[in-house]
Every structure is written in structure tokens, then in C-alpha cells.
Amino acid sequence: MLVVKKTPKINGILNAPPSKSYTHRAVICASLANGLSNLKNPLNGADCLSSAHACEMFGAEIELSDEQWVIRGSELKTPDNIVDIGNSGTTLRILTGISSQISNGYTILTGDDSIRKRPMQPLLDALKQLGIESFSTKNNGTAPIVVKSGKISNNVVEIRGDMSSQFITSLMMTLPFSENDSKIVLTTPLKSEPYLNITIDVLDKFGVKIEKNEEKNKLGYKIKGNQRYSPCEYIIEGDYSSASYLVAAGVLLNSDIVIKNVFKNSKQGDREIIEIVKKMGADVEINEDNVKITGPYNLKGIEIDVTDIPDLVPTIAVLGCFAEGKTVVYNGEHVRIKECDRLAACTLELSKMGAEIEEKKDGLIITGVHKLNGAKLKTYHDHRLVMAFTIAGMLADGETIIEGEDSVKISFPDFVDKMKSIGSNIEVI
């Protein structure tokens, strides 16, 4: 458990952790490239390590260290055992597609209790359109998933754009193996597009080209066939999702902090956290590779479309508690199918602290109360809730006890140490 007490001031310079999204994609691309790749500044978090270990089961040789991962990619081989991806939905979804391209046999992919509840059917349906056999062992669209090796036999695949961008990323990373050019056609408006921009960016660095396309008012992507992944040296940038908690702490508390390793021109959608706090009234200084914050600021409630930024919702919910007026979060139906139902969880748990939150079908309405009280909070094994609730606890009267703090190892392994280094009054017990 994490014990959080009111924190009068924070100050210091700290690095944002490396990007989880970039690390996942880069290690998988490197494993598919014949030759030696070097990933510098990777995220040594549980989810990304799941991707690395899974790639080893498909034949890659990977040397892991804190500063870099050295990866010798090879032709895909059939795993000798069941591929257990732990709690990483990204790993499960990308490798479900990729595993269809082993030369022979079957792949079985599974994960922990949480992963075995995450929806997979849209991806399985898409693979079926491509002529790939895959199925849920429970016949309910969840892991364990069985995938049979096979050639891609159809050139067009249709998939919803409003479920999970990870399904589309999986197709983007699999279709270059096709002997023919392919198209992905989105049948509904796209959500979380920045994550697909990250996928396209990483693929490009490894020699694979994806072209955005629109036909008959439907967005989609074109992928050339017979493409080959090429090894490279790749530097992982800092993670704006994880930096959002540092930004929130900076604008809400008496602060003087510099957050390094976050880039002004990043393709990450969650860089929007900077614009959000600015619109709420914070005078944040954004430089080429860092953010400087001297708080606190008097924030005002605003309306925020979270179509492309679902991971920022817990952070926004906490900011809204201390803003004047109402903060409205909308277009967030997909936030319900993350590690947990984050809309319901934020409503229930922050209400225990005295927050005024109304849960809507696609979002939240938060009325600023300016003052929260310490409480015992559940986090449902969700790393983003742990970190967002920690910031709330640092401003609350009394003591806040947060369960499940171990989940931060997924995306921000040294979160507690870094927060303590700038003066946060938190302890693990």
C-alpha cells in the first residue's frame, strides 16, 4: 500500500520515464528485423519486458540492460510454449497478428486475470477476413487466444476505429508480410489516432511504410506487400502519459520543477496534457526537450474531448477536482475498456475523498471542490489510477491510503522514488 500525506511543496529536476508505447513497438519491430538493432533509453517496465520476453519466444535474441536493449532479430519461429504476456494488452494484441506469420504450427497467447477479460474479438474477426485462423479458447472473444500460421489471402480488411487502436496497430505490423498490397478500412470514426501515428513512425524507422488513405468517406491505411523490417538504432523518447502526473502535481502544488525528456514536437497524443493545463489557466513553459512549471495556479474547469487521449482521463479527473467550476470529459466510451473501467473507478474512488463527480456514458462531469479529504482507495490493478490518486492524496487533508501501488511497475517503475526526490510526502508500507 501507498500512504500519501499532504505535501506543502515540490521542487527539483527529473526525467520523464521512457515511452511505453514506443518501447513496445520498437522491440517488436527490432525482433522482426534480420540483424542487430539497438534500442536506447527503453522503458524497463513490466509490460514492455513482457513484449521483449515474448519476442524471445518467437526467435529473437535480446540483451537487456537499463540503458539499452540489444536485439538480434530473425525469421519468426514457432514458440516452444504458451506465450504468457502478463498484464500487457499491447503485447497480446500486436503479437496475435504477428504470430500468424510463423512458418508452421500454432501459437497460444494468454495473460493474467485482467488480460483474460480484455476484448479481442474485433481483432480475431479482422484476421478471419485476411484468411487467418484464430480463436478464443473460451469462445467469448478473450484470451487465451490460439492462432494458426497461414498466408494472408485477402487484401482488404474492415475494422471498427472506435474500439482499440491496438487492434489496428496489430494489423499494420502484420500486413507487410503479405505477398500483395493491403488496405485497412475503418468502418467507424477513429479514436486514439495518435497511437497509430506512433506505430507508423516506429515502422518507418524500421523500413516499413504505411500510407494513410480515405475512400468513400472512410478513413483507412494502405500497406505495401512484401516489405521487410530493417534493423536500426532507435532512441526512445520520454512518455507524456507518465509525465502527466508530474505536470498535474506541478500546476496544483507550490512547485518549481523541470520535467526532462519530453519533446515539444512529439507524436504522442498525451502531449495534449500541456495544452489542457494551459487552457485551465496554468502558465507552463514548454521547451524543445523539457517542461518547466512554477505552481500553484488557479485553474478553471473546461470541456475536454478525450477521443485521442484516453490515458489522460484519471489525471484530468484529479485536475478537475481543484478547478473552479465544471470540468467536462466527453467522447470517452473507450476509457471503459482499459485496465479497468476508468470512468466508473475515478467516480467511485475520488468521491470517497469528497469529490463531486457525475459519471456519464461517455465521460465525466467534475465540479471543483478545491478540497479533498484523505481516504482508502482501490485502484483495480490500474497503474494510471495509482499515480493520479497519488497526486490527489498530496493535496488532500489527512492521510490517503492507496492499494495496489505495485502496478506502477507497468509504466513508471520508479514513480515513488522520483516523487519522493522532489519532496512528495509518500511512503510504501
UniProtKB/Swiss-Prot annotation:
<feature type="binding site">
    <location>
        <position position="338"/>
    </location>
    <ligand>
        <name>3-phosphoshikimate</name>
    </ligand>
</feature>
<feature type="binding site">
    <location>
        <position position="166"/>
    </location>
    <ligand>
        <name>3-phosphoshikimate</name>
    </ligand>
</feature>
<feature type="binding site">
    <location>
        <position position="21"/>
    </location>
    <ligand>
        <name>3-phosphoshikimate</name>
    </ligand>
</feature>
<feature type="binding site">
    <location>
        <position position="166"/>
    </location>
    <ligand>
        <name>phosphoenolpyruvate</name>
    </ligand>
</feature>
<feature type="active site" description="Proton acceptor">
    <location>
        <position position="311"/>
    </location>
</feature>
<dbReference type="InterPro" id="IPR006264">
    <property type="entry name" value="EPSP_synthase"/>
</dbReference>
<feature type="binding site">
    <location>
        <position position="311"/>
    </location>
    <ligand>
        <name>3-phosphoshikimate</name>
    </ligand>
</feature>
<dbReference type="InterPro" id="IPR036968">
    <property type="entry name" value="Enolpyruvate_Tfrase_sf"/>
</dbReference>
<comment type="similarity">
    <text>Belongs to the EPSP synthase family.</text>
</comment>
<dbReference type="InterPro" id="IPR001986">
    <property type="entry name" value="Enolpyruvate_Tfrase_dom"/>
</dbReference>
<dbReference type="GO" id="GO:0009423">
    <property type="term" value="P:chorismate biosynthetic process"/>
</dbReference>
<feature type="binding site">
    <location>
        <position position="118"/>
    </location>
    <ligand>
        <name>phosphoenolpyruvate</name>
    </ligand>
</feature>
<comment type="pathway">
    <text>Metabolic intermediate biosynthesis; chorismate biosynthesis.</text>
</comment>
<feature type="binding site">
    <location>
        <position position="25"/>
    </location>
    <ligand>
        <name>3-phosphoshikimate</name>
    </ligand>
</feature>
<keyword id="KW-0963">Cytoplasm</keyword>
<feature type="binding site">
    <location>
        <position position="164"/>
    </location>
    <ligand>
        <name>3-phosphoshikimate</name>
    </ligand>
</feature>
<feature type="binding site">
    <location>
        <position position="20"/>
    </location>
    <ligand>
        <name>3-phosphoshikimate</name>
    </ligand>
</feature>
<feature type="binding site">
    <location>
        <position position="192"/>
    </location>
    <ligand>
        <name>3-phosphoshikimate</name>
    </ligand>
</feature>
<feature type="binding site">
    <location>
        <position position="165"/>
    </location>
    <ligand>
        <name>3-phosphoshikimate</name>
    </ligand>
</feature>
<feature type="binding site">
    <location>
        <position position="20"/>
    </location>
    <ligand>
        <name>phosphoenolpyruvate</name>
    </ligand>
</feature>
<dbReference type="InterPro" id="IPR023193">
    <property type="entry name" value="EPSP_synthase_CS"/>
</dbReference>
<keyword id="KW-0808">Transferase</keyword>
<dbReference type="Pfam" id="PF00275">
    <property type="entry name" value="EPSP_synthase"/>
</dbReference>
<dbReference type="InterPro" id="IPR013792">
    <property type="entry name" value="RNA3'P_cycl/enolpyr_Trfase_a/b"/>
</dbReference>
<dbReference type="GO" id="GO:0003866">
    <property type="term" value="F:3-phosphoshikimate 1-carboxyvinyltransferase activity"/>
</dbReference>
<protein>
    <recommendedName>
        <fullName>3-phosphoshikimate 1-carboxyvinyltransferase</fullName>
        <ecNumber>2.5.1.19</ecNumber>
    </recommendedName>
</protein>
<comment type="function">
    <text>Catalyzes the transfer of the enolpyruvyl moiety of phosphoenolpyruvate (PEP) to the 5-hydroxyl of shikimate-3-phosphate (S3P) to produce enolpyruvyl shikimate-3-phosphate and inorganic phosphate.</text>
</comment>
<dbReference type="GO" id="GO:0008652">
    <property type="term" value="P:amino acid biosynthetic process"/>
</dbReference>
<keyword id="KW-0057">Aromatic amino acid biosynthesis</keyword>
<keyword id="KW-0028">Amino-acid biosynthesis</keyword>
<comment type="subunit">
    <text>Monomer.</text>
</comment>
<dbReference type="GO" id="GO:0005737">
    <property type="term" value="C:cytoplasm"/>
</dbReference>
<feature type="binding site">
    <location>
        <position position="89"/>
    </location>
    <ligand>
        <name>phosphoenolpyruvate</name>
    </ligand>
</feature>
<feature type="binding site">
    <location>
        <position position="384"/>
    </location>
    <ligand>
        <name>phosphoenolpyruvate</name>
    </ligand>
</feature>
<feature type="binding site">
    <location>
        <position position="342"/>
    </location>
    <ligand>
        <name>phosphoenolpyruvate</name>
    </ligand>
</feature>
<dbReference type="GO" id="GO:0009073">
    <property type="term" value="P:aromatic amino acid family biosynthetic process"/>
</dbReference>
